[in-house]
């Protein structure tokens, strides 16, 4: 169980990935992205998660550069967008992401959505980039069990990470169990369900008991389920608060109560319906 912001989980290829990071979905490019990245790194974060489609890789890259922390101490993730899927187009998209971020390599590169039929060619491109030493770990995002099963039929390298929507209303038990069995690390996007759970009565009671915020309880629940989590915030006080989750532990009863909130409810698209 992680006990500090710098604690890492070992991926199946031996690379260490921080349990906790900053997500920058819907963070504006330029100053907003730069300042939130700098604030996170200043306050001990070492993992930053962006994507081509977020259109803020430049701002993130400047934040990394201006943070004063050595590149090798950071864990930077980006993702290939749907329209760039395919072998050659993915290779080109990766180079563009690197250029925007002003980096020589990525720690993790993900296929953003499975879509219909291009993800195997896209995966071959990720395997090549990984073998060429341009990425330290490769993975997928929003893949359901059947997508992973299909991918693994032909994959030479198994994904190290699957980043999916995960929160108390979407606990993804089947997918969690499958990934655990395959040695694929699950990672949560939108862990706070875009703020929709902050007034939930069950969560409020648990938070009061531990003298924590609802957000802190949810993020702690992620970690106790063995799920890497990357909450988004642009406010420094919130960036600090989100990460203040290493000094308490949820009981099994707390965990069960939170698990029971599941309704298989999404704030993002259903991966089986987002076809391109």
From Swiss-Prot:
Pfam family, one: Aldo_ket_red
Entry-linked SUPFAM superfamilies: NAD(P)-linked oxidoreductase
Underlying gene: yvgN
Protein name: Glyoxal reductase
The protein's Enzyme Commission number: 1.1.1.-, 1.1.1.283
Keyword field contains Oxidoreductase: yes
Keywords, sorted A to Z: NADP, Oxidoreductase
Organism name: Bacillus subtilis (strain 168)
Classification via Gene3D superfamilies: NADP-dependent oxidoreductase domain
GO function term, MF aspect, one: methylglyoxal reductase (NADPH) activity
Catalytic activity entry: (S)-lactaldehyde + NADP(+) = methylglyoxal + NADPH + H(+)
Residues holding substrate: 112
Domain of life: Bacteria
InterPro entries in alphabetical order: AKR, AKR5G, Aldo/ket_reductase_CS, NADP_OxRdtase_dom, NADP_OxRdtase_dom_sf
Binding sites annotated in the UniProt record for NADP(+): 190-242
Family of this protein: Belongs to the aldo/keto reductase family.
């Amino acid at each position: 169980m992680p006990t500090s912001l710098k604690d890492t989980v070992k991926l199946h290829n031996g690379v260490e990935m921080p349990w906790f990071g900053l997500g920058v979905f819907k963070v504006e490019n330029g100053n907003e992205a730069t300042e939130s990245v700098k604030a996170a790194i200043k306050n001990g974060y070492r993992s930053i998660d962006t994507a081509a489609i977020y259109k803020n890789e430049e701002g993130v890259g400047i934040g990394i550069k201006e943070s004063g922390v050595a590149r090798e101490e950071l864990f930077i993730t980006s993702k290939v967008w749907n329209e760039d899927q395919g072998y050659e187009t993915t290779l080109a998209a990766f180079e563009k992401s690197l250029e925007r971020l002003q980096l020589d390599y990525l720690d993790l590169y993900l296929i953003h959505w499975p879509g219909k039929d291009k993800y195997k060619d896209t995966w071959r491109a990720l395997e090549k980039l990984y073998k060429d030493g341009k990425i330290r770990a490769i993975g997928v995002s929003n893949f359901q069990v059947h997508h992973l099963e299909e991918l693994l039929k032909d994959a030479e390298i198994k994904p190290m990470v699957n980043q999916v929507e995960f929160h108390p209303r979407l606990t993804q038990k089947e997918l969690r169990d499958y990934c655990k069995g395959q040695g694929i690390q699950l990672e949560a996007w939108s862990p706070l369900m875009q703020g929709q759970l902050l007034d939930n009565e069950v969560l409020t009671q648990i938070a009061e008991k531990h003298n924590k915020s609802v957000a802190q309880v949810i993020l702690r629940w992620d970690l106790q389920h063995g799920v890497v989590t990357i909450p988004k915030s642009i406010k420094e006080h919130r960036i600090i608060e989100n990460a203040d989750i290493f000094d308490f532990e949820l009981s099994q009863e707390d965990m069960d109560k939170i698990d029971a909130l599941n309704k298989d409810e999404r704030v993002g698209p259903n991966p089986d319906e987002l076809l391109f």
